[in-house]
Structures are given as structure tokens and as C-alpha cells.
Amino acid sequence: MANRLKEKYTNEVIPALSEKFNYTTVMAVPKVEKIVLNMGVGDAVSNAKNLEKAAAELELISGQKPLITKAKKSIAGFRLREGVAIGAKVTLRGERMYEFLDKLVTVSLPRVRDFHGVPTKSFDGRGNYTLGVKEQLIFPEINFDDVDKVRGLDIVIVTTANTDEESRELLKGLGMPFAK
């Protein structure tokens, strides 16, 4: 069974983008390459249990086992040693990526308090979009009673677009609610 969002991309977004930006071939049309979810757990330095809980929540959200990230160098001000586990990340591609993006746009983002759309300034100049989520409770898989601490996470949507404008049109076509 093909994903709903992937079908929308194939049937609606590709023709619309081809018309707007005058692409000669279908392969020139930008597409979502991968989505990276990153959860930095600063208090994991003092208590390793916090990192385990964060990783478990990230696994629930993404449906994939996260990679534990380690500190690249020691920073005395943060009481941080090189090689200490300080976060978790997941890279989603293919079917899981489209499922996550669909869930993010239709279910999770509307659950954010005082939500007026995602900011349009979060493009990096190369067609990638970064979104910060303040609390993991907006995802339907997270049970409110099981959460010990509200944690945020970063969501990076990597596209094959060359410019921010192309990327914005791609994400808008896929249903991303940008602020007016």
C-alpha cells in the first residue's frame, strides 16, 4: 500500500512544481530526501536514565531505534567530557519518512498550543527546513502519564531543492502549514 502523502506528491506536487519552476524532467523536481529527528538531553550527563527515557520516546515517535549521540569534545562549563552520551537521533527515509511527515502535518502540529503555522524563516539557504518542537507531548504515540519530563526535539527536513523558494513550495504542496 502506497503512502497517502507519497501519492499526493506524485499526482499533485510534481505537476504543480514542474509548471511553476519550468522543470524539463521529472527527476529535476525537488523531493524530500530524509527527515532527521534529534533530541539533545543535557541532563544525561548527571543521570543516564534520562537519556534512556528520551531514546525510548524518540523510538515511539519515529518507529525506529535511535542512535545515541556522544559529545565530540569536553566543555568544562557544561561539565561535559568527550565521548559521554548526550543525545539521540533518528534518520528517517522512504516509507517511514512519508508516514512521519504525514503524521507531523495532520496530527502533531495542530496539537501545538497557540499554533499559527510554522515559521518561514527556518530554511537554511540550501533548501533544507529545520523545525524545533518544544514538547514531545504533541505526538499521539506519547502517553501523557508516562512522561517524566517535557523534552523538545529538532526536526530537520532535508530536500533535494537547490533554493529555499523551491523547498517552501514543495513542503507547502505536501501540506506543511506555514505562518502567513
Curated annotation (Swiss-Prot):
Pfam families associated with the record: Ribosomal_L5, Ribosomal_L5_C
GO CC list: ribonucleoprotein complex; ribosome
GO molecular function: rRNA binding; structural constituent of ribosome; tRNA binding
Superkingdom of origin organism: Bacteria
Biological process according to GO: translation
UniProt keyword annotations, A-Z: Ribonucleoprotein, Ribosomal protein, RNA-binding, rRNA-binding, tRNA-binding
SUPFAM superfamilies: RL5-like
Key word Ribosomal protein present: yes
Xref: InterPro entries: Ribosomal_uL5, Ribosomal_uL5_bac-type, Ribosomal_uL5_C, Ribosomal_uL5_CS, Ribosomal_uL5_dom_sf, Ribosomal_uL5_N
Record's subunit section: Part of the 50S ribosomal subunit; part of the 5S rRNA/L5/L18/L25 subcomplex. Contacts the 5S rRNA and the P site tRNA. Forms a bridge to the 30S subunit in the 70S ribosome.
NCBIfam families the UniProt entry points to: PRK00010.1
Family label: Belongs to the universal ribosomal protein uL5 family.
General function of this protein: This is one of the proteins that bind and probably mediate the attachment of the 5S RNA into the large ribosomal subunit, where it forms part of the central protuberance. In the 70S ribosome it contacts protein S13 of the 30S subunit (bridge B1b), connecting the 2 subunits; this bridge is implicated in subunit movement. Contacts the P site tRNA; the 5S rRNA and some of its associated proteins might help stabilize positioning of ribosome-bound tRNAs.
Name of the protein this chain belongs to: Large ribosomal subunit protein uL5
Source species of the chain: Streptococcus uberis (strain ATCC BAA-854 / 0140J)
Gene assigned in the entry: rplE
